[in-house]
A protein has these predicted regions:
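Short N-terminal "domain-start" leader segments
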Residues: 1-46
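Mixed-charge, Lys/Arg-enriched low-complexity segments
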Residues: 44-94
Length: 94
């Protein structure tokens, strides 16, 4: 049975980069191309895990905006814990 838009998911991880001054970053694993897949996965694996999950495919653009806002807050030094991230993304999580 083919996947419908409602069952597709985007796997992602928010992490603190081990390089580049410890900035918080996100990687959307299921959207990586072959040319950047290995590098992006290695960067995430070296970093400090903050949050991961699956976003609903149909809501991915709105969810990415929320993720960007979370990253901005983290990179400004705000304390945003896992529960706050989950709450912010709740309506977009699969």
């Amino acid at each position: 049975m083919p996947l419908t838009t409602d069952t597709k998911k985007v796997m992602f991880e928010i992490y603190r980069d081990a390089d580049y001054g410890g900035r918080y970053r996100v990687v959307y694993f299921t959207e990586l191309g072959e040319h950047d897949k290995e590098t992006e996965i290695e960067n995430a694996m070296r970093g400090e895990h903050i949050f991961d999950g699956f976003l609903l495919h149909r809501e991915r653009n709105q969810a990415k905006q929320v993720v960007d806002e979370i990253l901005d807050r983290l990179n400004r030094g705000e304390n945003v814990d896992e529960n706050a991230i989950r709450e912010s993304l709740q309506r977009y999580l699969a």
